């Protein structure tokens, strides 16, 4: 909220609000998670001021709720995100993503020789937490990559 307590992005009556997305990550989430493949209204706030983060992105999707799996898959991109369930303009549920064991149907394998590029299969990566990194192992070629390599793909 601004100092005069006005919302910078209009409130929604029912749906999902993904808040505290790192700045410049909102559009990537929209495309990777196919959040725009709906006829419901989507409101996007980019580079909004944030006391905690300096700047943040925000996504509001009316009449749509994320599954627990979708919420947890956000952890790679927005580990500090808050996912709010809204009903009748009130927050009725709040969750934070936690790193899942697998990420399916979202990422693309960076190995150009991987069979997932030539065959009609859904992507699938095992998530492995390392000391200072997160590694992703492709189900098909079994190669392991730093999450930054896969995310840049």
Swiss-Prot record:
Involved in allosteric regulation of aspartate carbamoyltransferase. Its cofactor is Zn(2+). The keyword Zinc applies. GO terms for biological process: 'de novo' pyrimidine nucleobase biosynthetic process; pyrimidine nucleotide biosynthetic process. One of its GO terms (cellular component) is aspartate carbamoyltransferase complex. Belongs to the PyrI family. This is Aspartate carbamoyltransferase regulatory chain. InterPro entries: Asp_carbamoyltransf_reg_N, Asp_carbamoylTrfase_reg, Asp_carbamoyltrfase_reg_C, Asp_carbatrfase_reg_C_sf, Asp_carbatrfase_reg_N_sf. Binds 1 zinc ion per subunit. Keywords: Metal-binding, Pyrimidine biosynthesis, Zinc. Heterododecamer (2C3:3R2) of six catalytic PyrB chains organized as two trimers (C3), and six regulatory PyrI chains organized as three dimers (R2). GO terms for molecular function: metal ion binding. Zn(2+) binds at residues 109, 114, 138, 141. The keyword Metal-binding applies. It comes from the Bacteria.
């Amino acid at each position: 909220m601004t100092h005069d307590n006005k919302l910078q992005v209009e409130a929604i009556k029912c749906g999902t609000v993904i808040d505290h997305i790192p700045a410049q990550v909102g559009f990537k989430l929209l495309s990777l998670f196919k959040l725009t493949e709906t006829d419901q209204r989507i409101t996007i706030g980019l580079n909004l001021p944030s006391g905690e983060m300096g700047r943040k992105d925000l996504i509001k999707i009316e009449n749509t709720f994320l599954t627990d799996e979708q919420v947890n898959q956000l952890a790679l991109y927005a580990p500090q995100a808050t996912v709010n369930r809204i009903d009748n303009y009130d927050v009725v549920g709040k969750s934070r993503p936690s790193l899942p064991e697998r990420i399916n149907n979202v990422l693309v394998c960076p190995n150009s020789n991987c069979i997932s590029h030539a065959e009609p299969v859904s992507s699938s990566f095992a998530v492995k937490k390392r000391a200072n990194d997160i590694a992703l192992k492709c189900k098909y070629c079994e190669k392991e990559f730093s999450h930054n390599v896969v995310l840049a793909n």
